[in-house]
Amino acid sequence: MIVVVAPGQGSQTPGFLEPWIAEPRFREHLQRISDSVGIDLVKHGTTSDEDTIRDTAIAQPLIVAAGLLAFEGLVPDNGKLAIGGVAGHSVGEITASVLSGILSEEEAFRFVKQRSQGMADAAALVRTGMSAVIGGDEDALLTHLKDLDLEPANFNGGGQIVVAGELTKLAKLAENPLPGTRVIPLKVAGAFHTHYMEPSVAALHEVAASIWASDPLLPIWTNRDGSLVESGTTFVDLMVSQVTSPVRWDLTMVALSAAGVTGLIELAPAGALVGLARRGLKGVPTVAIKTPDDLAAAHDMMNGK
């Protein structure tokens, strides 16, 4: 079973869409998305600097758009994809919801526009951020986080937990890491997937209630607990609550393994989830789609080559 996964925030880099817009069909697609959300994603994906695309109001629609461009390149001429399911990490769940048929592209960008702006507004209230903690004992780390008034935001598997909170408290964690751990500050603009995002929930819930969600045509796993979700409405509700809840990518990988995954394709901007799969899904072949040149390898995987 081949699974397609979509990355979350922090995977974007300056100019990463440059190779994509060199092809007219991808440039036209990106321009349509830009027009629909009122954000110049062509500019932000090609010439905007690192600080600009760190802004979550820009980063989220940019990442979802990139994933959909890559997915467009995956779909063969006959429209039949040889994949067994989809999943997304954080905002990547919105990408996955389009892939599975839960949301139309238009509805997905209505949702991500509200999600990104609401989370940006919430992040502006308090100076917060996120750091990855590599290694160490999970229980000891969680206890240490409570002592520092920090929260776990992503359980990524393979010994990596992303923590979030006020910048001063993250600095204390970095200054005094637990034995056997490394602390790496992340290039994101807030404490996502924590209580700091609570101010964004009400408006996002209103948008979610106004959009049409179909039941998935492809199996889709949720970040909440790694379970398969069969109701489109339920999946959208989970995406709303996810903004204040930890991403359980570790449980998602456990579920993929149990489902018999034999190959994993990560959509653009790829790299992070393939890296996690090397530790959490050992032995499973992967393809990271970073540019259109990587599509051939993804097609080969889907065709069993």
Regions found by a protein language model. Give the residues of each.
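A short, well-structured juxtamembrane/interface segment
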Residues: 247-255
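Short Gly/Pro-enriched loop/turn and capping motifs at secondary-structure junctions
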Residues: 227, 246, 270-272
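FabD-like malonyl-/acyl-CoA
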Residues: 1-140, 186, 263-293
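Alpha/beta catalytic cores of group-transfer enzymes, especially the acyltransferase/condensing modules
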Residues: 9-11, 37, 49, 100-244
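Non-catalytic positions within long, well-ordered alpha-helices that form the structural scaffold/packing
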Residues: 257-260
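Charged catalytic carboxylate motif
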Residues: 25, 62-66, 169, 203, ...
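Short, charged, surface-exposed secondary-structure boundary motifs
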Residues: 196, 295-301
